[in-house]
């Protein structure tokens, strides 16, 4: 996000020194977070590295300004497709990672744990679809449309015309949490707007 913000402001103000700063940040970002398996570490703290596959990395592939090249972005999109994508959004943690808990049920502390350990978040799908479009262009349109259809049934199930906060990370992907969540609706609408730019 810092890299994207620096480049955005540099373009806005015409400040090349900000671009130079962004380029330095980009090199540091890649050296620190890109691992040999082609995806981004979730966090690095000194010598401690979290190899969990989480959706935070999708932002680096989706933003207009990114230190990643196309091949690196594709690696991120591909691992998100394989391990995080559900019909209801991106899981907050891969099922292959330790501590995976896909079910947002039980007392508050249990739900709070599951929230970041495997539930599917619809709003993250917007950034995933944006990154997918940037990699696969026109061939992505049908794939994205099929995924969006999965949200239509939700708009009559919980709160009419809206989408729940989260979904269980495993089938049958039950809607949980708040029955209406503005970020989810906003990202679906933003995705439709992105598709419209392809005259779709």
Task: Give the label of every model feature segment.
Residues 14-17, 137, 193, 199:
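Short, flexible coil/linker elements and helix-boundary hinge sites characteristic
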Residues 99-140, 189-193:
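C-terminal substrate/ligand-recognition segments
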């Amino acid at each position: 996000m810092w890299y994207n913000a620096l480049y955005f402001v540099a373009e806005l103000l015409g400040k090349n020194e900000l671009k130079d700063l962004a380029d330095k940040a980009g090199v540091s970002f890649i050296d620190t977070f890109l691992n040999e398996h082609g995806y981004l570490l979730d966090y690095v703290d000194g010598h401690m590295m979290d190899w969990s596959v989480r959706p935070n990395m999708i932002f680096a592939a989706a933003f207009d300004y990114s230190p990643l090249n196309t091949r690196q972005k594709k690696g991120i999109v591909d691992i998100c497709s394989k391990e995080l994508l559900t019909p209801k959004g991106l899981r907050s943690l891969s099922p292959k990672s330790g501590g995976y808990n896909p079910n947002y049920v039980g007392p508050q502390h249990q739900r709070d744990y599951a929230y970041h350990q495997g539930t599917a978040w619809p709003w993250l799908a917007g950034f995933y679809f944006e990154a997918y479009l940037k990699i696969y262009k026109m061939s992505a349109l049908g794939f994205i449309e099929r995924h969006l259809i999965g949200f239509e049934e939700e708009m009559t199930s919980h709160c009419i015309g809206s989408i729940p906060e989260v979904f269980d990370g495993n089938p049958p992907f039950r809607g949980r949490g708040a029955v209406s969540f503005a970020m989810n609706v906003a990202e679906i609408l933003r995705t439709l707007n992105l598709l419209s730019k392809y005259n779709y």
